[in-house]
Amino acid sequence: MEEKVYEYDSVIQEAEKKGGAYVTFPYDVREEFHAGRAKVHAEFDGEPYDGSVVNMGLKYPDGSVCYVIGIRKEIRAKIAKQPGDLVHVRVRLRE
């Protein structure tokens, strides 16, 4: 079976009071991965990162859960992007 890849553009958001940043994952993690969080391989403008899609307590305006993927400072430096910038994201589940 072919592995599903999620590909989209997202604005990098600043993590308040932590100096970090993240992008939203615009899919329902429970529906897509049958779990509340998922270990993923992500690429931000082609720069690889292994991390997780998680719920950090954020909600969309309609009240639904907003899942996020952290984007490390080192990766932001490599792709020359900061909070407020648009980034191309590719995500796939990792074992």
What is the meaning of each model-derived region?
Residues 1-65, 83-95:
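Long, compositionally biased stretches
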